[in-house]
Amino acid sequence: MKKRVTGIGGVFFKTKDPDKVKEWYNKHLGFNADDYGCSFWWKDIEGNDAMTQWSPFPENTDYFEPSKKDFMMNFRVENLDELLETLKKEGVQVIDKKESYEYGKFGWIVDLEGNKIELWEPVDQAFKQDEPDDK
Protein backbone atom coordinates (compact mmCIF):
# COMPACT_ATOMS: atom_id res chain seq x y z
CA MET A 1 0.00 0.00 0.00
CA LYS A 2 1.15 3.52 -0.76
CA LYS A 3 1.64 6.05 1.99
CA ARG A 4 -1.64 6.46 3.89
CA VAL A 5 -1.67 10.18 4.76
CA THR A 6 0.53 12.61 2.86
CA GLY A 7 -0.33 15.83 4.69
CA ILE A 8 -3.00 18.05 6.15
CA GLY A 9 -5.64 18.91 3.58
CA GLY A 10 -7.71 21.25 5.67
CA VAL A 11 -8.88 22.57 9.00
CA PHE A 12 -12.64 23.08 9.29
CA PHE A 13 -14.44 24.52 12.31
CA LYS A 14 -17.85 25.83 13.34
CA THR A 15 -18.39 29.53 14.03
CA LYS A 16 -21.30 31.79 14.92
CA ASP A 17 -20.59 34.04 11.93
CA PRO A 18 -18.22 32.64 9.27
CA ASP A 19 -18.10 35.93 7.34
CA LYS A 20 -17.04 37.93 10.41
CA VAL A 21 -14.47 35.27 11.27
CA LYS A 22 -13.03 35.45 7.74
CA GLU A 23 -12.92 39.26 7.96
CA TRP A 24 -11.10 39.07 11.32
CA TYR A 25 -8.51 36.61 10.00
CA ASN A 26 -8.04 38.77 6.90
CA LYS A 27 -7.56 41.97 8.91
CA HIS A 28 -5.32 40.57 11.65
CA LEU A 29 -3.54 37.64 10.01
CA GLY A 30 -3.68 38.49 6.32
CA PHE A 31 -5.88 35.59 5.20
CA ASN A 32 -7.24 36.10 1.68
CA ALA A 33 -10.51 34.23 2.26
CA ASP A 34 -13.20 33.54 -0.32
CA ASP A 35 -16.60 31.87 0.11
CA TYR A 36 -14.86 28.61 1.09
CA GLY A 37 -12.18 30.02 3.36
CA CYS A 38 -8.48 30.44 2.62
CA SER A 39 -6.19 28.24 0.54
CA PHE A 40 -2.54 27.87 1.52
CA TRP A 41 -0.20 26.75 -1.27
CA TRP A 42 2.98 24.81 -0.65
CA LYS A 43 5.25 22.26 -2.35
CA ASP A 44 5.21 18.58 -1.50
CA ILE A 45 8.42 16.58 -1.09
CA GLU A 46 8.58 15.94 -4.86
CA GLY A 47 8.19 19.67 -5.57
CA ASN A 48 4.58 19.48 -6.75
CA ASP A 49 2.13 22.26 -5.93
CA ALA A 50 -0.17 21.32 -3.04
CA MET A 51 -2.91 23.11 -1.13
CA THR A 52 -4.31 23.12 2.39
CA GLN A 53 -7.73 24.66 3.06
CA TRP A 54 -8.81 26.68 6.13
CA SER A 55 -12.61 26.97 6.35
CA PRO A 56 -14.98 28.36 8.98
CA PHE A 57 -18.46 26.79 8.81
CA PRO A 58 -21.76 28.01 10.25
CA GLU A 59 -22.38 26.56 13.71
CA ASN A 60 -25.55 24.81 12.51
CA THR A 61 -23.80 22.85 9.74
CA ASP A 62 -24.47 19.13 9.54
CA TYR A 63 -21.30 18.55 7.48
CA PHE A 64 -19.36 17.30 10.53
CA GLU A 65 -21.98 14.66 11.44
CA PRO A 66 -22.06 12.05 12.85
CA SER A 67 -19.47 13.81 15.04
CA LYS A 68 -20.81 16.24 17.62
CA LYS A 69 -17.52 18.16 17.63
CA ASP A 70 -17.06 21.74 16.43
CA PHE A 71 -14.17 20.89 14.12
CA MET A 72 -13.11 18.42 11.45
CA MET A 73 -9.66 17.65 10.08
CA ASN A 74 -9.04 16.82 6.44
CA PHE A 75 -6.05 14.67 5.54
CA ARG A 76 -4.52 14.32 2.09
CA VAL A 77 -4.14 10.69 0.96
CA GLU A 78 -2.55 8.97 -2.06
CA ASN A 79 -5.21 6.36 -2.78
CA LEU A 80 -8.59 6.95 -1.16
CA ASP A 81 -10.31 3.73 -2.24
CA GLU A 82 -7.44 1.50 -1.14
CA LEU A 83 -7.06 3.32 2.18
CA LEU A 84 -10.78 3.12 3.01
CA GLU A 85 -10.78 -0.63 2.30
CA THR A 86 -7.72 -1.11 4.51
CA LEU A 87 -9.20 0.97 7.33
CA LYS A 88 -12.47 -0.95 7.15
CA LYS A 89 -10.54 -4.25 7.48
CA GLU A 90 -8.73 -2.78 10.49
CA GLY A 91 -12.06 -2.09 12.21
CA VAL A 92 -12.14 1.67 11.70
CA GLN A 93 -15.62 3.21 11.36
CA VAL A 94 -15.83 4.16 7.67
CA ILE A 95 -18.77 6.35 6.64
CA ASP A 96 -20.47 4.64 3.71
CA LYS A 97 -20.28 7.59 1.34
CA LYS A 98 -17.74 8.89 -1.17
CA GLU A 99 -17.79 11.98 -3.36
CA SER A 100 -15.78 12.93 -6.45
CA TYR A 101 -15.16 16.38 -7.90
CA GLU A 102 -12.71 17.82 -10.40
CA TYR A 103 -10.45 18.71 -7.44
CA GLY A 104 -10.40 15.22 -5.93
CA LYS A 105 -12.13 12.33 -4.21
CA PHE A 106 -13.43 12.41 -0.64
CA GLY A 107 -14.28 9.80 1.97
CA TRP A 108 -14.85 9.97 5.71
CA ILE A 109 -13.99 7.99 8.82
CA VAL A 110 -14.63 8.43 12.54
CA ASP A 111 -11.75 8.13 14.99
CA LEU A 112 -11.85 6.44 18.39
CA GLU A 113 -13.07 9.65 20.10
CA GLY A 114 -15.92 10.28 17.67
CA ASN A 115 -14.17 12.89 15.51
CA LYS A 116 -15.21 12.82 11.87
CA ILE A 117 -12.14 12.90 9.63
CA GLU A 118 -12.29 13.77 5.96
CA LEU A 119 -9.88 11.93 3.67
CA TRP A 120 -9.04 13.67 0.39
CA GLU A 121 -7.26 12.30 -2.66
CA PRO A 122 -6.51 15.70 -4.19
CA VAL A 123 -6.16 16.99 -7.72
CA ASP A 124 -4.37 20.23 -6.81
CA GLN A 125 -4.07 21.32 -10.44
CA ALA A 126 -7.84 21.93 -10.52
CA PHE A 127 -7.33 24.85 -8.10
CA LYS A 128 -4.40 26.39 -9.95
CA GLN A 129 -6.59 27.86 -12.69
CA ASP A 130 -7.88 30.39 -10.14
CA GLU A 131 -4.57 31.14 -8.46
CA PRO A 132 -2.01 33.78 -9.47
CA ASP A 133 1.25 32.45 -10.90
CA ASP A 134 3.40 34.11 -8.23
CA LYS A 135 2.60 31.58 -5.49
Feature annotation, model-predicted:
Residues 17-19, 67-68, 72-116:
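Vicinal oxygen chelate
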Residues 2-6, 12-55, 89:
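Core segments of cupin and vicinal oxygen chelate
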Residues 40-41, 102-103, 129:
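Positions that flank functional sites
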Residues 1-22, 70-75, 123-135:
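N-terminal beta-strand motif that seeds the catalytic metal site of vicinal oxygen chelate
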Residues 51, 86, 120, 129-133:
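Short, charged, solvent-exposed linker or helix-capping segments at domain edges/interfaces
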Residues 45, 106-107, 129, 133:
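Short Asp/Glu-rich motifs
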Residues 1-2, 61-64, 97:
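Short, flexible, glycine/charge-rich loop motifs used to bind or transfer phosphoryl groups or to couple energy/partner
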Residues 30-68, 109-112, 116-124:
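Conserved short beta-strand elements that form part of the metal-binding/catalytic scaffold
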